[in-house]
């Protein structure tokens, strides 16, 4: 259960870092300072989101597991009960 959550967070962090790297201008010092402030704010928000995501339990996972197991259950019922 921890791997998908951490993978999701890693994808977001990599996506944000890539977009910030591409958007950073090199010639304008004011724009560089603004980009640095934006990067720091994004890093802080990402850290808060990670802490919040790791602190909360996932109430939807049992329901999601049930929904993903329905085709398997249907196949088992058809194979064992209906077709004998």
Curated annotation (Swiss-Prot):
Protein name stated in the entry: Myrmicitoxin(1)-Pm1a
Sequence similarity: Belongs to the formicidae venom clade 1 family.
Role summary: Toxin that potently modulates mammalian voltage-gated sodium (Nav) channels, reducing the voltage threshold for activation and inhibiting channel inactivation. Is selective for tetrodotoxin (TTX)- sensitive channels. Shows activity on hNav1.6/SCN8A (EC(50)=285 nM), mNav1.7/SCN9A (EC(50)=352 nM) and hNav1.7 (EC(50)=403 nM). In vivo, causes spontaneous, gradual and long-lasting nocifensive behaviors by intraplantar injection in mice, as well as noticeable swelling of the injected paw. Does not have effect on insects (blowflies).
KW Cell cycle (keyword) present: no
Localization terms from the record: Secreted
Entry keywords, A to Z: Amidation, Ion channel impairing toxin, Neurotoxin, Secreted, Signal, Toxin, Voltage-gated sodium channel impairing toxin
UniProt keyword annotation of Signal present: yes
Primary site of residence: secreted
Signal peptide segment: 1-22
Example of a GO cellular component annotation carried by this entry: extracellular region
Known tissue expression: Expressed by the venom gland.
Modified residues (Asparagine amide): 83
Additional notes on this entry: Negative results: does not show activity at hNav1.8/SCN10A (EC(50)>1 uM) and hNav1.9/SCN11A (EC(50)>1 uM). Does not exhibit hemolytic and cytotoxic activities on HEK293 cells.
Organism: Pogonomyrmex maricopa
GO terms assigned for molecular function: sodium channel regulator activity; toxin activity
Propeptide cleavage-removed residue intervals: 23-59
């Amino acid at each position: 259960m921890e791997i998908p959550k951490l993978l999701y967070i890693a994808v977001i962090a990599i996506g944000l870092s890539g977009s910030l790297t591409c958007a950073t201008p090199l010639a304008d010092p004011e724009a560089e300072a603004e980009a640095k402030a934006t990067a720091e704010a994004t890093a802080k928000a990402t850290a808060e989101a990670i802490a919040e995501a790791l602190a909360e339990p996932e109430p939807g996972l049992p329901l999601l597991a049930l929904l993903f197991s329905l085709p398997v259950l249907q196949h088992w019922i058809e194979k064992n009960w209906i077709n004998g």
